[in-house]
Amino acid sequence: YLNLRRSQPTSYMALINTGKSFILSLSPELFFRRQGKIITTRPMKGTSCRGFSLDEDNKNRQELTKDTKIKAENLMIVDLLRNDLGRIAQKVCVPQLFQIDIYRTLYQMTSTIEGKLSKEDIKIKDIFTSLFPSGSVTGAPKIKTMDIIHSLEKEPRGIYTGAIGYISPENDACFNVAIRTIFLNGGKVELGIGGGIVDDSVEKYEYEEALLKAKFLTEKFWKYFSFTTIR
């Protein structure tokens, strides 16, 4: 876990020791954060690999920024989460749209949605009832998509695409979306990876994107290098 933290630092990491197994989460995605009456969610939709030269790296970032298919998918999730948040919050807004986050092995497109909880006594379970699972996992329409996933997948996902987080004594909370999350049980290691399929998805590219998301674990850490431009 410490090696992965150093090699692939992300914002919503977690380590859980159940006594019989371990969960190592290197999730870069915020499911929701509650701070007082403010609730924030930050869905992630859109992935591109880093380049092996400065020119290639900049090119990959620009292509992700301009990709109309990915932006349409991201906007679909934003609209879905605005609707989900609207059940428990007022003044729902989108302060950041199509932001590019930089990681050692890839770029990710994210957007931020915020709202003000409509009641003082809204509990964490009410938030989960409205938001879970994350719209970035299901796509839209949410219930129909979940029915399709259930009919296609023959085994439960376990922790994968669930949520890991904490609740403070003041009832503030922060939970990730359990992607890039490893389950260790005895000598067995599980890592769930996947992606969203839409009408104009290309099978080859979707498969390559799924493998890219697993590179933090499947390839040697020293293979990766990155460029940072300071302005």
Residues covered by each model-derived region:
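Extended alpha-helical targeting/anchoring segments
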Residues: 1-231
